[in-house]
Design a protein with these regions (language model features):
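Cytosolic-side membrane-insertion boundary helix
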Residues: 213-238, 269-279
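Juxtamembrane inter-helical linkers in multi-pass membrane proteins
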Residues: 91, 258-270, 440-446, 696-700
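Post-cleavage N-terminal segment of exported redox proteins
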Residues: 1-49
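Soluble extramembrane regions of membrane proteins in the secretory/endomembrane system
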Residues: 31-229
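Perimembrane loop-to-helix junctions flanking transmembrane segments
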Residues: 40-44, 310-324, 616-619
C-alpha cells in the first residue's frame, strides 16, 4: 500500500473516531445522573442540599480523592471504594431496621425470611425518586435515618475518633488520624458519598439497571451483572479473534523489506551534537533522579499496605501521609516518562534536519527551568492540599485536584500546557528545514509533527472540567489525558522516533519504515481512540459507551498479538553488525518494551478489559498489575531506552561499562516481573475470587485485606521491589558516570 493511501486511511480513522468520541461525550452529558437541588424525606425534612454534594466532592478531593480509596472503582487500593462501602453499610442498616420494624432480629432470621427483607430493601433503594420538575431526590424516613447514622460513622473515621475500633480501621485504610478538621466539611463529604452510592444502585429511568450498569457487584441490593455486559464481552472477544486473523494474513503475505548491505561503520559516529542537543543532557539527569525519588515513594506507599500508620515504626503519617506519597509516586511517573520523551524529541529534531536554529539552546534551557518549576510547585501544592492547609478553591488551583494521574492543581496544569506548547515551538522550528527539502523523509516528518502537535494540545483535555464538574464528565475528560495523551499519541511519537533512529543507523529503509509506521499508527488508533471508553464502563455512562469501549478496546490488543515479531526484529538488529554493539542496551530496552507490551498491556490488560471481567475486577489489585506492567514496563522502559539512545550520541567517543548498565537493565526487568507476579497478582486473584463469590465491597474491605495470608503476600513483594530499586539506582549511577568517567570503558 502506498503512503498516500495510508494517509487517507489514517485521516479517516482519526476523523471518524473523534467524531464518535465527541458525539458520545455529549451523550454522557445528556444522560448523566442528576445533581439534585436537595435531598428530602417524604415528610419534607431536608437531609442535605445539592450544593453540599458538590462541596463534598471537593472536600473528598482535598484529602486526596482517588489516592484515598476510590469512588465508582477509580482510584487507590488500600482504602475501600467509598461508594461500594457506603452502599453495603446502608444495606446492612436498612435490613436491620426493616426487621426491627416487625420486632425481629435480621441476623438471626433463617435465609428464607432474610430474603423477604432483601426484596423490601431492593424496592427501597433501587426506585428512582428523582423529580425532574423540582430537581429533588426523596428518601423514606427510614433511609434518611440510616444516612444520618452513616454520616456519624464516617465522621468518626475521618475526624479522628480515638476509640480502638476506628484507630485500627484508619490504620487498615492508611488514613491520617485526622483527615479532616472541620465537621461541616465532613457533613458535605458524607453527602457526596451518599449521592455517589445512590448513583450506583438507583435504576435509570425506564430501565431496571442502575446508572453505573449495576456496578458494584452486590447481590443483596440487586446489583448483578446485566445482560449487556455478557453480550458485549462476548462480542469483544469475537472482534479480537477476527481482527487477529486479518492481521496475521496481512503479515503472512507481506514481504519483509530488509536493508541489502548494512553500513560498515556507525553512520551517527561522526555526528557532532549541537548546543541544543547537548542541553538535553540535564533533562536526562533530572529524569534519572526523578526515577529514584518515584521509586522511593512507591516503596513507602506499598509499605502503607502492611503498616498503615508508620514506616517500620516511624510515624511518617504526620508529615508524609499515604495520600501524598501515592500522589507523588503516580505524578512523578507521568512527569519523568513524559520528560524523557520530550528530551528525546528536542535531541532528535536538530539531528533529523541537520540545522540548529538560532537561540534553540536558550529555548531548551528555558523549557527545562519551566518544567522543573512545575514539577516542584505541583508536588508542594499537593502536600499543602492534603494536609488541609488550603481552602477548597485554593486547593483546586494550587493543591490536589483529587483525580488520579492529573492530581496537580489547575494552575500547574496550565503552566505545564504552556511548557508543552513551548516544546512544540522548539520542535517545529528545528524540523522546518527538513520539511522544506520535500525528500523521502517527508512522510515520517509529517507524522512526527502531527504526534508532537497531539502531545502539546491533547493535554488541554485536562482543562475541560471545572472544580465542581459532574464526575461522569470529569472522568470522560480525565481519560482523554491518561488514555489518549499518555497511552495514545506518545506511543505514536515514540514509534516515529524509533523509525528515524533505525533509518539514520542504516538498519531500515526509509520507504519501508514509512509504510510500517503509518500502517502501525492506523491499526493502533483504530482501537485506541474509541478504546478510551473501556475506562468508563461503570462511570455513570449509557450502555452505548460500554458497547463501544468493549468493542474497540479489544482491537487495541490486536497488534500486541504479533509483537513478538517486532521483538525478534529488534533482536536481529542488535546482532546485525559489529558496530551496532554500541547501541545494544537501547535496543534491548525496545525488546523489553515489546515483552511488557505483550504481557502488561496485552495479557494483563485484556484480562480486565471485557466488561464482564472489569465488572468484578475494577479497582482491585488486578488493575495495579496492569498499571505497573504497562505504564512502567512499556512507557517507562521505552523512555529509558530513548534516553540511552540520546546518551549514545551525546557521548559518542566512549565505550560503555556494559556490566553496569547490563546489571541495571536485568535487575529492573526481573524486579518488576517478580513484584507484579509474586505479590500484586496473587492479591488481585484472591480479591477477584471474593468479589465474584460474594460482593465487591467485601474484596476491598479491611476484614478481607488484613487477613494474615494477605499480609504475607504483600511482604512477598520485597525481593522484587529490592531488585527493581537497586536496578534503578545502578541506572542513575551509570547515567552520571558517563559524565564523570566511571561508566566509560575506553574509546570506540
Amino acid at each position: 500500500m502506498t503512503p498516500k493511501k495510508l494517509w487517507y486511511a489514517l485521516a479517516a480513522v482519526i476523523l471518524l473516531s473523534f467524531g464518535v468520541l465527541g458525539f458520545f461525550g455529549l451523550e454522557i452529558f445528556r444522560t448523566m445522573p442528576p445533581f439534585p437541588t436537595k435531598v428530602v424525606t417524604t415528610d419534607g425534612t431536608t437531609l442535605f442540599e445539592g450544593q453540599d454534594i458538590k462541596d463534598g466532592q471537593n472536600v473528598w478531593q482535598s484529602i486526596g480523592g482517588q489516592t484515598v480509596g476510590s469512588v465508582w472503582g477509580h482510584g487507590a487500593y488500600i482504602a475501600p471504594d467509598w461508594s461500594a462501602d457506603y452502599l453495603h453499610r446502608e444495606a446492612e442498616l436498612l435490613l436491620k431496621k426493616l426487621a426491627e420494624r416487625d420486632g425481629l432480629d435480621y441476623a438471626s432470621l433463617p435465609a428464607a425470611e432474610q430474603a423477604k427483607y432483601q426484596v423490601l430493601l431492593r424496592e427501597e433503594v433501587r426506585k428512582n425518586t428523582f423529580d425532574e420538575a423540582t430537581g429533588v431526590i426523596t428518601y423514606s424516613p427510614l433511609r434518611a435515618e440510616v444516612a444520618r447514622e452513616l454520616g456519624a460513622y464516617y465522621a468518626k473515621l475521618f475526624l479522628g475518633d480515638t476509640s480502638p475500633e476506628f484507630v485500627k480501621l484508619r490504620s487498615a485504610y492508611a488514613l491520617r488520624d485526622k483527615s479532616l478538621e472541620d465537621p461541616r466539611k465532613m457533613e458535605q463529604m458524607s453527602a457526596f458519598f451518599a449521592w455517589a452510592s445512590w448513583v450506583c444502585v438507583t435504576n435509570r429511568p425506564g430501565t431496571d439497571v442502575s446508572y453505573t450498569n449495576n456496578w458494584p457487584h452486590d447481590p443483596t441490593i440487586g446489583n448483578i451483572a446485566p445482560t449487556s455486559l455478557h453480550l458485549w464481552s462476548g462480542f469483544s472477544v469475537l472482534m479480537l479473534l477476527t481482527c487477529v486473523g486479518i492481521l496475521v494474513y496481512y503479515y503472512a503475505q507481506s514481504k519483509e523489506d530488509e536493508v541489502g548491505v548494512l553500513p560498515t561503520s556507525d553512520p551517527l559516529r561522526g555526528m557532532k551534537p549541537t548546543p541544543s542537543m547537548r542541553a538535553t543532557t540535564k533533562y536526562i539527569w533530572i529524569v534519572s533522579l526523578l526515577i529514584l525519588v518515584q521509586m522511593v515513594l512507591g516503596a513507602i506507599t506499598a509499605h502503607y499496605g502492611v503498616e498503615g500508620d508508620a514506616l517500620f515504626g516511624l510515624p511518617i503519617q504526620d508529615f508524609l501521609p499515604q495520600a501524598v506519597s501515592r500522589s507523588w509516586h503516580v505524578q512523578l511517573a507521568i512527569l519523568w516518562i513524559a520528560t524523557s520523551w520530550l528530551a528525546t524529541g528536542l535531541y532528535i529534531a536538530p539531528a533529523v534536519s541537520g540545522v540548529e536554529p538560532k537561540f534553540q539552546r536558550l529555548g531548551v534551557n528555558v523549557l527545562f527551568g519551566a518544567l522543573l518549576f512545575v514539577v516542584v510547585g505541583s508536588l508542594v501544592g499537593q502536600w499543602f492540599g492534603v494536609m488541609q492547609k488550603l481552602g477548597l478553591i485554593e486547593n483546586f488551583w494550587l493543591g490536589h485536584q483529587g483525580y488520579e494521574y492529573v492530581e496537580l492543581g489547575r494552575l500547574w496544569q496550565i503552566l505545564l500546557l504552556v511548557g508543552l506548547v513551548l516544546w512544540l515551538f522548539l520542535m517545529i522550528r528545528a524540523l522546518i528545514p527538513a520539511l522544506k527539502r520535500k525528500d523521502e523523509n517527508r512522510h515520517l516528518l509529517t507524522l512526527f509533527i502531527i504526534a508532537s502537535l497531539a502531545i502539546a494540545f491533547f493535554y488541554a483535555a485536562g482543562l475541560m472540567y471545572g472544580r465542581q464538574t459532574h464526575m461522569a464528565i470529569a472522568e470522560y475528560w480525565r481519560w482523554w489525558v491518561v488514555h489518549l495523551w499518555v497511552e495514545g499519541f506518545f506511543e505514536v511519537f515514540a514509534t516515529v522516533v524509533a523509525a528515524f533512529l533505525f533509518c539514520r543507523l542504516g538498519l531500515l529503509r526509509i520507504q519501508s519504515a514509512t509504510v510500517s509506521v503509518l500502517f502501525s499508527t492506523i491499526i493502533f488508533l483504530s482501537g485506541g481512540i474509541l478504546g478510551t471508553f473501556h475506562h468508563l464502563y461503570f462511570s455513570a455512562t449509557p450502555t452505548a459507551v460500554l458497547a463501544l469501549g468493549a468493542t474497540f478496546s479489544a482491537l487495541e490488543i490486536v497488534p500486541l498479538v504479533l509483537i513478538g515479531m517486532e521483538a525478534y526484529h529488534n533482536y536481529k538488529l542488535s546482532k546485525s553488525t559489529d558496530w551496532i554493539e554500541a547501541y545494544k542496551w537501547p535496543i534491548y530496552c525496545f525488546i523489553a518494551m515489546c515483552f511488557w507490551n505483550f504481557l502488561g498491556a496485552g495479557i494483563f490488560g485484556f484480562a480486565i478489559n471485557p466488561p464482564i471481567a472489569l465488572y468484578y475486577l475494577q479497582g482491585l489489585n488486578t488493575t495495579a498489575v496492569h498499571g505497573h506492567a504497562a505504564l512502567f514496563g512499556v512507557y517507562g522502559i521505552l523512555g529509558i531506552g530513548l534516553m540511552l539512545f540520546c546518551l549514545r550520541g551525546l557521548y559518542p567517543d566512549y565505550k560503555w561499562n556494559d556490566k553496569l548498565i547490563g546489571t541495571a537493565f536485568w535487575m529492573i526487568n526481573i524486579g518488576l516481573f517478580l513484584m507484579v507476579t509474586v505479590s500484586v497478582l496473587p492479591i488481585g486473584i484472591l480479591q477477584a475470587h471474593e468479589s465474584i463469590t460474594n460482593a465487591y465491597w467485601s474484596a476491598r474491605s479491611a476484614e478481607f485485606m488484613q487477613q494474615d495470608h494477605m499480609q504475607l503476600i504483600r511482604w512477598m513483594r520485597m525481593p522484587g521491589d529490592l531488585l527493581l530499586g537497586i536496578g534503578e539506582l545502578l541506572l542513575v549511577v551509570f547515567i552520571f558516570g558517563l559524565q564523570f568517567g566511571w561508566s566509560r570503558k575506553g574509546t570506540r
